[in-house]
């Protein structure tokens, strides 16, 4: 019995431990188990001695009493037990994953159905547009005929590229494997999952951004390329300008010219070029020898010249005038057959047909350029050098052909102009006249022979050339007539020699070699030679060329030293005149004077940028106030001052200032700044610099100033920025200190006193002199002034009775004044009363405003403390402070625009104007004038001619 009782006690203890044990580990997973379905094991057996059970915080193992009778157990209130040793987390994880899958699948199906339903609803809401298909052009429906969809399909990405765009399922599986740690906050699985998701989104974003970056990069590269070529173009234009300046400044000593040994004929040609310019400038003619080719139109002058030069270098026309200006051709011997112009470095290869065509075209262009508008021919000479093997050294001048009748399309004075040009060249006593006569026409039709006989009646420097002898032999019935011409018996003229030549068959495409062969063949078979009518030395252009060259050099040796002596005497006279008139001045020609003036002008422009900011702001503020003072006082201050209270005054002022700022003020400010810049620029350009001032530059400086100002335009954005700045300045009403208050009062007093002075002068002119001036200066009033004076006195009486009178007279007041004046015998018109009242009231108002301004000197304390005192409402002082502050800020802003931008832009304009003037020779001649300039120009030219003549004479003696 005792043992049974002990066992029952032990069992109750065990049950109580099971019920109340708190040693279950919270981290273990739960499992639902029924108490009946499990065996409870106890650690004590009945065979053992009963001991006191040990209390434990957790049960690792349970045991049961086997000898206890079986009885019905009662269910415990706790229906769940814990099994610490068994872990079922894989099964639980699978269960949760299955639940997540069902959730995702269900959401996808439901979302898809909802989206389809929404799409169908939207589709039903769209109206049926099938009836309006006719509006769409047919080209839209037939677009498949114009677009190759197969090519587009091939351009689309293939399946491999699409696979790359598909989601990475391996990453998805890896993310699902980390769902075990997903439900734990801050776990690594969650971090990895979010990082992966963020990475996929960033990849899509990166692809979008990369495409946009490519487009931006391509646009930027295109812009850089445009800027690059724009800079190259600007650099080339600048280099071109500089090169043109260097060409104009031939005497620039800064450039090292390599000294080349020139041939004798080239040196002589340079002398003739310089003399040609000198003769054209001073309307004189030198006496140096040259071969002058004259003849009737289409007589073959150009063909003879081409045969001598051995190249078809001149433009040709059948019966049409092609030689429109003199062409000076300098022939010299050289290894290559080339031609070049005096003012160009391009060489034309005369052995190539394309170069010959280009040369003929260039000569024609130069001729047309020399011919002025309304003229047919020009006296200006084109200088051409031709070098080649076997050429005779000489200088020939091809003149326009002499005509007998002026045809349609020609200028009326063409015939006289051609005669004057020909006479100018032939009257040179040392010129060799190469008279060309067409042998295929009657001798009686010749015009040039009479002209040549007048210029050289004794024939001491004339060579007669009969052209087209082949045609003459066929057409002329009597061959003796040709013999008479060659012997000088037919024409009334004499010559040193007579020659007969053949210059081709009339085909312009014939080469020089073919013409020479034809000429030699003709004279070998000609009856004229066989019958001794012509001598062998009188035929062919080769013999002609040798004879002309010998005659030319003989004339040169005889006359060149005499010409040099005459230029030495001219130089001595000019130098003596310079020493007597300008003993302390250096001899500067027009180009050198222009460079000196250019440097002075640029220095004056730089000094413009060195003016102090204070100077700029003072003149800007003063000029701006002079421009806007009338508007401020007449249209803003006076209308606002007629109001009854300060609120209405401020409202009126704000409205009028806003309207003024939006419309007129910025434009006025820019105009003032531009006029100020012009004034300062003119002052720096025109003010004398003391004794060193040279008045010879005055016209040039004035022209540069006017042209620079005309080209300069103020920045377009200046008005917009000024409008904002001025509006903000006028919005501010807070005067911070007493010094600003006093400055505003002083500014207001000055403005009102100036207006009061103008009003006093207007009243004085209206009413005439007062009694003092009438007694001292013996002045009287006119009848009208007397009426004005009586009216003024009557109005002043009315103002004394009511000093608070408004600005306008009422009709009954006008009637009262008129009746009072009529009672004193003064007839007055109502309009005269109004005019007089305007000036009288204006003076009264300005005096009252000045007195009020004086009272406001002690009103800053009331203004600062916002006291309300009707006697010291100084709103007008605040208005003038706002105006003064706006003027200061505007002047500061305009000064910054001037010094930072506009002065530099003006300097750039001045440089461009000077560069343009430097390239315009006529402009320099017009602006740099005077005896001193002309004398320096003469000295320079004569010295250059004499130096070249001396060098040529020295080379000529060495050749002997």
Swiss-Prot record:
Residues 295-302 are annotated as: G1 motif. PROSITE patterns: G_DYNAMIN_2. The keyword GTP-binding applies. Mg(2+) binds at residues 302, 323, 398. The modification N6-acetyllysine is found at residue 228. The keyword Electron transport does not apply. GTP binds at residues 298, 300-303, 317, 468, 470, 503. One of its GO terms (molecular function) is GTPase activity. Residues 321-324 are annotated as: G2 motif. It catalyses: GTP + H2O = GDP + phosphate + H(+). Residues 88-96 are mitochondrial matrix. Residues 1-87 form a transit peptide. Its EC number is 3.6.5.5. Dynamin-related GTPase that is essential for normal mitochondrial morphology by mediating fusion of the mitochondrial inner membranes, regulating cristae morphology and maintaining respiratory chain function. Exists in two forms: the transmembrane, long form (Dynamin-like GTPase OPA1, long form; L-OPA1), which is tethered to the inner mitochondrial membrane, and the short soluble form (Dynamin-like GTPase OPA1, short form; S-OPA1), which results from proteolytic cleavage and localizes in the intermembrane space. This is Dynamin-like GTPase OPA1, mitochondrial. It comes from Pongo abelii. The gene is OPA1.
């Amino acid at each position: 019995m005792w043992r049974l009782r002990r066992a029952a006690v032990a069992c109750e203890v065990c049950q109580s431990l099971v019920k109340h044990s708190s040693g279950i580990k919270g981290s273990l997973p739960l499992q639902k188990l029924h108490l009946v379905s499990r065996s409870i094991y106890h650690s004590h057996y009945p065979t053992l001695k009963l001991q006191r059970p040990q209390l434990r915080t957790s049960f690792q193992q349970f045991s049961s009493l086997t000898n206890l009778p079986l009885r019905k157990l009662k269910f415990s209130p706790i229906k769940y037990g814990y099994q610490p040793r068994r872990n079922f987390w894989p099964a639980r994880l699978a269960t949760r994953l299955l639940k997540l899958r069902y959730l995702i699948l269900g959401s996808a199906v439901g979302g898809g159905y909802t989206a389809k339903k929404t799409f169908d609803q939207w589709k039903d809401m769209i109206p049926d547009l099938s009836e309006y298909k006719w509006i769409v052009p047919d080209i839209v429906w037939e677009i498949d005929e114009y677009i190759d969809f197969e090519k587009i399909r091939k351009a689309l990405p293939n399946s491999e590229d699409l696979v790359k765009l598909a989601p990475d399922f391996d990453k998805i599986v890896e993310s699902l494997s980390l769902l075990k740690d997903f439900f734990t906050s801050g776990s690594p699985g969650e971090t990895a999952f979010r990082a992966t998701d963020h990475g996929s989104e960033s990849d899509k974003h990166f692809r979008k951004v990369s495409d946009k970056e490519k487009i931006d990069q391509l646009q930027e590269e295109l812009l850089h390329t445009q800027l690059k070529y724009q800079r190259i173009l600007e650099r080339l234009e600048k280099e071109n300008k500089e090169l043109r300046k260097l060409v104009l400044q031939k005497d620039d000593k800064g450039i090292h010219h390599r000294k080349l040994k020139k041939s004798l004929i080239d040196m002589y040609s340079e002398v003739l070029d310089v003399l040609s310019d000198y003769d054209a400038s001073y309307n004189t003619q030198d006496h140096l020898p040259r071969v002058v080719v004259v003849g009737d139109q289409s007589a073959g002058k150009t063909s003879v010249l081409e045969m001598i030069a051995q190249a078809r270098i001149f433009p040709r026309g059948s019966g049409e005038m092609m030689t429109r200006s003199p062409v000076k051709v300098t022939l010299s011997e050289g290894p290559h057959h080339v031609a070049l112009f005096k003012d160009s470095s391009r060489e034309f290869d005369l052995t190539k047909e394309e170069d010959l065509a280009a040369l003929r075209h260039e000569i024609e262009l130069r001729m047309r350029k020399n011919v002025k508008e309304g003229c047919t021919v020009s006296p200006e000479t084109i200088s051409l050098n031709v070098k080649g093997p076997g050429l005779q050294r000489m200088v020939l001048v091809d003149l326009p052909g002499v005509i007998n009748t002026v045809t349609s399309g020609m200028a009326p004075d063409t015939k006289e102009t051609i005669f004057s040009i020909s006479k100018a060249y032939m009257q040179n006593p040392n010129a060799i006249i190469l008279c060309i006569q067409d042998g295929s026409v009657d001798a009686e039709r010749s015009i040039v022979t009479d002209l040549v006989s007048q210029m050289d009646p004794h024939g001491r420097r004339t060579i007669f050339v009969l052209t087209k002898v082949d045609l003459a032999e066929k057409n002329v019935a009597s061959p003796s007539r040709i013999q008479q011409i060659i012997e000088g018996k037919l024409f009334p003229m004499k010559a040193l020699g007579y020659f007969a030549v053949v210059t081709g068959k009339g085909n312009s495409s014939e080469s020089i070699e073919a013409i020479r062969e034809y000429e030699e063949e003709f004279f070998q078979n000609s009856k004229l030679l066989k019958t001794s009518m012509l001598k062998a030395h009188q035929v062919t252009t080769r013999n002609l060329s040798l004879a002309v060259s010998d005659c030319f050099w003989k004339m040169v040796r005889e006359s060149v030293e005499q010409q040099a002596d005459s230029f030495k005497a001219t130089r001595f006279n000019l130098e003596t005149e310079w020493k007597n008139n300008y003993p302390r001045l250096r001899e500067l020609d027009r180009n050198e004077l222009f460079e000196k003036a250019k440097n002075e002008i640029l220095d004056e422009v730089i000094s413009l940028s060195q003016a102090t900011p204070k100077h700029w702001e003072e003149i800007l503020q003063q000029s701006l106030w002079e421009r806007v003072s009338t508007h401020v006082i007449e249209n803003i201050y006076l209308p606002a001052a007629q109001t009854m209270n300060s609120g209405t005054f401020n409202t009126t002022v704000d409205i009028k200032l806003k309207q003024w700022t939006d419309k007129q003020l910025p434009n006025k400010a820019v105009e003032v700044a531009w006029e100020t810049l012009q004034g300062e620029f003119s002052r720096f350009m025109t003010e004398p610099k003391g004794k060193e001032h040279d008045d010879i530059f005055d016209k040039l400086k004035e022209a540069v100033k006017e042209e620079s100002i005309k080209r300069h335009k103020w920045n377009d954005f200046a008005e917009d920025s000024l409008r904002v700045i001025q509006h903000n300045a006028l919005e501010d009403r807070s005067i911070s200190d007493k010094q600003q208050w006093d400055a505003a009062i002083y500014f207001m007093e000055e403005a009102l006193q100036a207006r009061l002075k103008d009003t006093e002068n207007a009243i004085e002119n209206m009413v005439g002199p007062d009694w003092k001036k009438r007694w001292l200066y013996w002045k009287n009033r006119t009848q009208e002034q007397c009426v004005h004076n009586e009216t003024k006195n009557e109005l002043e009486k009315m103002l004394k009775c009511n000093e608070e009178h408004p600005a306008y007279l009422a009709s009954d007041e006008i009637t009262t004044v008129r009746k009072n004046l009529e009672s004193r015998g003064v007839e007055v018109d109502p309009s005269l009363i109004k005019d007089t009242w305007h000036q009288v009231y204006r003076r009264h108002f300005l005096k009252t405003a000045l007195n009020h301004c004086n009272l406001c000197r002690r009103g800053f304390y009331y203004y600062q403390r916002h006291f309300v005192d009707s006697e010291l409402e100084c709103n007008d002082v605040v208005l003038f402070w706002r105006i003064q502050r706006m003027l200061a800020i505007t002047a500061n802003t305009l000064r910054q625009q001037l010094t930072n931008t506009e002065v530099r832009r003006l300097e750039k304009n001045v440089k461009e104007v000077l560069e343009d003037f430097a390239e315009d020779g006529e402009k320099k001649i017009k602006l740099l004038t005077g005896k001193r300039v002309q004398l320096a120009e003469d000295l320079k030219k004569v010295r250059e001619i004499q130096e070249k003549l001396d060098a040529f004479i020295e080379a000529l003696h060495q050749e002997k």
